[in-house]
Amino acid sequence: MNIQIDMIDHTDTLTEKQETLIRELLHEAARYEKLAEGTYELSLSFVSDEEIQELNRDYRGKDQPTDVISFALNEVGEGEQPVEPEAGTPNLLGDIIVSIPRCQEQAEAYGHSFERELAFLIVHGFLHLLGYDHMSEDEEKKMFMRQEDILTAYGLTRS
């Protein structure tokens, strides 16, 4: 399994070391989730609060900044058929957008490192791309447990 990550830091905040951590973490998450053999692709953007607020307003009807937004390309709506990638082309998972200011604020509020919070948000977004959600209490419990399991497997604990 191969995962291609198109990463754009619109804030010019992330270090090379942090970008490496992100790539390694996403590969770990893909292994943990046992993605089928093949090539996968996702885009990952790091933005300001203003940029994520605009996306949140335009696509979710919530005129406020948030920490992470995901747009799953493989999400199948009611009455829709799943789209299979053409042979030899990557399976496009979707887009993850993270607010760097919100990530920094939450890291301070929760008393852990910026990297830990960044990893949490990215894994959260990645799981949404794979179909996880937290609309019900049971879904939320399952999703948040998966997030913690992946972060622990990678060696990023809350402390």
UniProtKB/Swiss-Prot annotation:
Pfam families xrefs: YbeY
The keyword DNA damage appears for this protein: no
GO MF annotations in UniProt: metalloendopeptidase activity; RNA endonuclease activity; zinc ion binding
Biological-process GO terms, alphabetical: rRNA processing
KW Phosphoprotein (keyword) present: no
Reported cofactor(s): Zn(2+)
EC supergroup of this enzyme: hydrolase
Record NCBIfam families: rRNA maturation RNase YbeY
Localization in the cell: Cytoplasm
Similarity remark: Belongs to the endoribonuclease YbeY family.
Note on cofactor: Binds 1 zinc ion.
Cellular component, GO annotation: cytoplasm
SUPFAM superfamilies the UniProt entry points to: Metalloproteases ('zincins'), catalytic domain
Function: Single strand-specific metallo-endoribonuclease involved in late-stage 70S ribosome quality control and in maturation of the 3' terminus of the 16S rRNA.
Protein name: Endoribonuclease YbeY
